[in-house]
């Protein structure tokens, strides 16, 4: 099963200059909880923004250029990335924008954090048809001392 996990501000903004323009430790904990012990697939720019392999997960990076870091597995295509995951029960696609776009048609599940923030961004989550997805989980949280904005965790499954 292929799943996409992303945090989206208003207008599906997911990043600005290769970073996330908000401070939400609760979202990072949600991300870790849902990706731990699963393969994670990302693009080269996402890999560079993280700067290190995510522990407890097989890290796979899609890039047209050969990678030099042997702590992760480098592949050149979506199909190679899927093959590199072997018989994993769930593959977690963690970004960025182009990688989400390539995997969305193959995805069975979306783990989305909707952030109540209007921020400028240069990277967006791809547009998806809400009629193709059913919300199976939703949990709202107000902003607090640790989290800069209110947010809602949602899990969608393809109908």
Swiss-Prot record:
MF-aspect GO terms: dihydrofolate reductase activity; NADP binding
Record's keyword terms, sorted: NADP, One-carbon metabolism, Oxidoreductase
SUPFAM superfamilies xrefs: Dihydrofolate reductase-like
InterPro entries, per database record: DHFR, DHFR-like_dom_sf, DHFR_CS, DHFR_dom
Pfam family, one: DHFR_1
Binding sites annotated in the UniProt record for NADP(+): 7, 13-19, 45-46, 63-64, 76, 95-102
Catalytic activity: (6S)-5,6,7,8-tetrahydrofolate + NADP(+) = 7,8-dihydrofolate + NADPH + H(+)
Binding-site residues for substrate, renumbered to this chain: 5, 27, 52, 57, 113
Catalytic activity, EC: 1.5.1.3
Family annotation (CDD domains): DHFR
GO cellular component: cytosol
Taxonomic superkingdom: Bacteria
DHFR domain location: 1-158
Residue spans crossing the bilayer: none
Pathway: Cofactor biosynthesis; tetrahydrofolate biosynthesis; 5,6,7,8-tetrahydrofolate from 7,8-dihydrofolate: step 1/1
One Gene Ontology biological process: folic acid metabolic process
Function: Key enzyme in folate metabolism. Catalyzes an essential reaction for de novo glycine and purine synthesis, and for DNA precursor synthesis.
Membership in a protein family: Belongs to the dihydrofolate reductase family.
Protein name: Dihydrofolate reductase
Native organism: Klebsiella aerogenes (Enterobacter aerogenes)
Gene: folA
